[in-house]
Regions:
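Conserved class I S-adenosyl-L-methionine
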Residues: 114-124
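Conserved SAM-binding motif I beta-strand of class I
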Residues: 138-143
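Short alpha-helix immediately C-terminal to the canonical SAM-binding loop
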Residues: 149-150
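A short SAM/SAH-binding and catalytic strip from SAM-dependent methyltransferases
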Residues: 182-198
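C-terminal substrate-binding/active-site "lid" region of AdoMet-derived donor-dependent transferases
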Residues: 197-264
């Protein structure tokens, strides 16, 4: 079921991107309703639309039939948030989010893998943590930028979904305070843009908490395009870190993101656990 949903999401994304004639800075789509192509829990789908509707980065929406699927197109602008996000010295990547549907799929996979807590590192507007929350995770959203955390607070209040936004430097935060048992960490940074340094720091912190790594998963956002990565493309550019820190790859899924909207390849997300 999940594999076909992912393929259908990629199909409508590519069809939409090929025919999009608008001028919005960012744009993404969410199916209007559950269907055979998108067998999503109706309550969850309603919450995904609520996230977009209550999120100030989106200024317009309209319905469109894409590859035979009724969808809502959301158009937005993240320029101000992007500019604000790059002012922090330890920030590993400017705010450039994955798609809401992609965030849901990733959280769904993590749930199937047995994790109960979701920690979104460099969380932007909190969409992965939000999706974790509606799927029953205890979510924590770690973001260094105060403006983005303010945006998350607004979304929490408007959607009645508290995914625990925290304005803090992920490199300095004491994760033992969260009393994690079976967490999955999502690393918000590509390897060639400082994400490798962020990930290495988070792994060190996981290792510093007694017995935590036994039940911990880490998800990395990778790339399939040589122009973005001059080194090893295997595992989305994360192979060296995966080998160095003795991680096993347990799943890889490629999904639409804001930054691959104009590309024929999607963003690979690599699910790993400690050996």
């Amino acid at each position: 079921m999940l594999d076909s949903l992912v393929q259908n999401l990629i199909k409508i994304k590519q069809d939409f991107a090929k025919n999009y004639s608008g001028s919005a800075h960012i744009q993404e789509i969410i199916p209007s309703q559950a269907s055979d192509s998108f067998p999503i829990d109706k309550t969850h789908l309603k919450q995904l639309h609520a996230f977009a509707e209550k999120n100030p980065i989106y200024f317009n929406s309209f319905e469109e039939i894409i590859s035979g699927v009724s969808c809502i197109v959301y158009e937005g602008d993240i320029n101000d948030y992007w500019l604000n996000s790059i002012k922090h010295g330890s920030s590993c990547q400017p705010f450039y989010p994955t798609w809401i549907m992609s965030a849901y799929v990733m959280a769904f996979i993590a749930k199937k893998l047995g994790y109960s807590e979701l920690v979104d590192i460099g969380s932007g507007d909190g969409r992965i943590a939000f999706c974790g929350n509606i799927l029953g995770f205890t979510s924590y959203s770690i973001e260094i930028d105060d403006v983005l955390v303010g945006l998350q607070d607004t979304i929490c209040a408007q959607t009645n979904q508290n995914f625990n936004p925290r304005c803090t430097d992920a490199l300095e935060f004491d994760y033992s305070k969260l009393n994690l048992k079976t967490p999955v960490f999502f690393i918000g940074g590509l390897p060639q843009m400082g994400g490798d340094l962020l990930a290495a720091s988070i792994i060190e912190k996981i290792n510093s908490i007694v017995n935590l790594k036994i039940n911990t998963g880490i998800v990395f956002a990778g790339t399939n395009t040589q122009r973005q990565l001059s080194g090893n493309l295997s595992n989305g550019g994360w192979s060296n870190l995966i080998e160095e820190h003795h991680l096993d790859v347990i799943d890889t899924v490629s999904l639409p993101t804001i930054w691959t909207f104009d590309q024929l390849v999607e963003t690979p997300y690599i699910f790993t656990k400690f050996k």
